[in-house]
Structures are given as structure tokens and as C-alpha cells.
Amino acid sequence: MKYSKHLRFVLVLVCTLIPFLLGPKVSAEENNSQVGFSVSPNYNEAQNKESSFFDLLVQPNSKQTISITVTNTSKEDSNYTVKVIQASTNKNGVIDYTDSKAKALGSVPFELNKQTSYEEKIKLSAGETKQVPITLSIPDKPFKGEVLGGVNVTKEIPKQDKTPQLVNQYSYVIGLRIREGSENSERELSAGEVKPVVSFGKTGITVPISNVQANAMGKLTVESVLKREGKEIKKDTDKDREIAPNSVYPYSLSWDK
């Protein structure tokens, strides 16, 4: 696809710094009887008692141990994968707590996958319950703002010798927020290089919007205008977008009708 040098892209960001909102303390797509297992958080003394997810107020150069309780409510032995994942921002402008491949910006206070230790694989007999400790090692260097992530527990699908078929795979996610105080870092968003893209046969542009600070942003309005030789050919407004701390929102705009 040729990208005309006469095309001009204008991006306007209107944002509000909002309190961290994660939703329910534990989320899954079905109820326990359908999923076949349950997960619940076990808080420690650093927990904000007003929060239903892990919400920790910590000190630099310290260790914190939290835990989750996993119960196999099915009638079969099952294997589970546990992962602590850094929050990222998906292409829809929503904070994502499940993408283990997403990379945080270099400005992040610390990466959860490097500062946590826990048992990643567990096996439970039918009806068995197990507590899984998670140790957080807080770095020496103090930080303002927050580090966000999620504790993900996924039930593994047994290997089948039969013909491949569509099988539901279930996961629970418990939010994790780590702070060292109530002071927030300043808001700062930056837009990267505008590039042409073709996705599912549609042409458009993509531009990375970076949140370089350690604070989640919500109620974000993105206004974009695409012009050719001064004439507007596409205009779009996206409201109520979110960006995770120290993450990139891969914003895109299609100019096809």
C-alpha cells in the first residue's frame, strides 16, 4: 500500500486521571459449577481493606507474600497454570490483565514477572483445595504511582488423542495493584510514528500512544482527523478509553468506509 506524503494525521487526546478500577475481585466467564474450579484471594497486612482485589501499600526494599486458594470443584483431577501478568493496553483501548506477551515501557518502576516467585504449575485431585503463595520482592528504588497486574489461573485442557475440536478454556483473574504511597506521578502521554496498515483488507493508519507514567488513565477521549491536501477524508472520536501504567495503546484508524 502506498502512503501519500500529502496525507496529514491530527491526533487530540483528552484524558482524566482516575482511581484504579478493576471490577469484580475475581472474574471468570462462567459460574464455578460450569468452570470446574474456583479461585479466591488471601490478603496480607499490606492490603487496602476497601478493595476486593490485591491492593498493596508497600515499602521499598521489602518482601510481601500474598496467596490464592484454588479449589477443584469438578469430579476429575485437573492441572492449572498460575501467572502473574503486568497490565497492558489492548487495541480497543481497554486495560488488559491477561496478555503475558505484552511488554511494559522502560519507565515502569519494576516488572512483575521479574519480582514475583510462585508455583506456576499445580495439580489438584477432584475436590482438592490448595493455597498458592506469591512472594513479591519490592526493589530498593522508591517510585510514585502504581504497578498494576493480574494473578491469572487457567485450567489446562487435557491432551486429546481424538480429532481436534472446539473446547472452552477457563481462567480466573484477580487484580493486583502495588503502591508505595498515595502520591501519583504526573500525567504524560506521547504519540509515536504514524504508519500505514492493511488489516482484514481495510486500509488505515496506526499510531502508538504511550503512557510513560506509573498511573492508569481512564475516561480518555481520542479524536483523530485524517486529511489529504488539506481536505478532511476521515474523522473519528473514541470515548471512555483506558491506558495501563507504563504501556502503549496501539491506536488505529481505518479510512475505508
List the predicted regions and their residue ranges.
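Sec-dependent N-terminal signal peptides of Gram-positive bacterial secreted proteins and lipoproteins
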Residues: 2-28
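Proline/serine/threonine-rich low-complexity linkers at boundaries of modular beta-sandwich domains
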Residues: 30-48, 178-188
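Beta-sheet-dominated interaction scaffolds and their linkers
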Residues: 41-74, 121, 189-200
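Ligand-binding face of N-terminal immunoglobulin V-set domains in extracellular IgSF glycoproteins
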Residues: 62-71, 78-86, 92-94, 107-163
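Short beta-strand elements
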Residues: 68, 162-183
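Short acidic, flexible loop segments centered on an aromatic residue
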Residues: 78-92, 96-105, 216-231
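Intrinsically disordered, low-complexity Pro/Gly/Ser/Thr-rich segments with frequent PxxP/GP/PP motifs
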Residues: 101-141, 226-257
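Membrane-proximal extracellular "stem/stalk" segments
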Residues: 182-257
